[in-house]
Amino acid sequence: MKLSVVIVSYNVKYYLEQCLLSLRRALRGIPAAIWIVDNNSHDNTPAYIAARFPEANIIVNNANLGFARANNIAIKQARGEYLLLLNPDTIVPEDTLARCIRFMDNRPDAGACGVAMLKDDGSFAYESRRGLPTPFTAFCKISGLCALFPRSRLFGRYYLRYLNKNKINRIDVVSGAFCFLRRSAIDKVGLLDEDFFMYGEDIDLSFRLLNAGYKNFYLPLRILHYKGESTQKSSARYLHVFYNAMLIFFNKHYRARFPLLAPIVRTAVTARALLDFCSQKNKRLKLKNKHKKNWLFIGQRETFILARQLLSDNATDLDFVEASEKNLPHGHLDLSRKLNRYDCVVYDTDAFSYKRILLIMAHEHGVNRLRLGTFSPLSGRLVTMDRVY
């Protein structure tokens, strides 16, 4: 066994289905196993996935055990030279895993590697590579200095934006959304710390890998990450869990060295959480006022007919371009029509490879980027970040 893929799922069965469809292509020719740990979903995820993906090993928990604990359950049972911890709200292109394996095979000093995560508008997610949140780095993030001077090697350590995103780089923290790990390294440093319910466990694991003498890397390979579709990222609960993880990390690794900073860190983290909650609430109000639904579908005619039927009751105008990546290699970017009338482009995944779709989206330019939707004839579902049809 070369690779075991571990996915923790909670009430996202259609996003998980899309992820698994992409994995079927990405795992061709690789001796691999897929482990799905369901954290007591209420949307019938285990039965739905088992009927469509008999090759997957499914573990069903009777409660939401959190991300770290659920991953550990599968890691203990999984076999393979490598482990991939993967979020269910992702799309993995066809050659990504083979290239990760090739890199890790050639770098025995590598403990983990991450990739370039794209948002649904094709923009680069800064969480793809991060520095360790030392007290100073965390201060720069919380105070806004990191945002003011993003490319500064002093103030911008949190997101490492001074590094070239198109080149392989050594980094500190590999994101838990796509964390490609050497199994022997995990056996050496231990499993995910279950004190972290969700968020922060990837930082802690990356830190322990570095302390054990391994190196962590960023590879310029694209995946799509809807960024937490299974969580309400603007909710008070999300912000509490996210910022509490920062406190857990500080208390575990830095409090003994900087005891006087503890009350300052707690106050700063609490204040930042409140600011973010207010900011996210305002964003939600703005999104509710957005009614534009003009979409562009690119793919096969018979597939378009199926997709249009899904949208018939959703007040969505769906224009059609019959094409494939062979005759329209740059997708909507090759079209002469004005694209600013659309806010979403839907690609037929039978007519375009996942790799090609993400390549096209990554080359989007301008402020008004189109958001991505995908339609798979195999699932009969049209998937966007906001909704599944």
What does each model-identified segment do?
Residues 60-78, 99:
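Glycine-rich, basic loop-to-helix element that forms the pyrophosphate-binding segment
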Residues 132-171:
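Short, flexible, basic/aromatic active-site loop/helix in glycosyltransferases
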Residues 164-166, 172-222, 360-362:
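A short, conserved alpha-helix in the catalytic core of glycosyltransferases
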Residues 12-27, 332-333:
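Short, well-formed alpha-helical segments that are part of the catalytic scaffolds
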Residues 207-282:
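Active-site-adjacent helix/loop segment of glycosyltransferases
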Residues 22, 38-47, 63:
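A conserved acidic beta->alpha catalytic loop
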Residues 83:
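Short aromatic/hydrophobic "clamp" motif used to bind/position activated sugar donors
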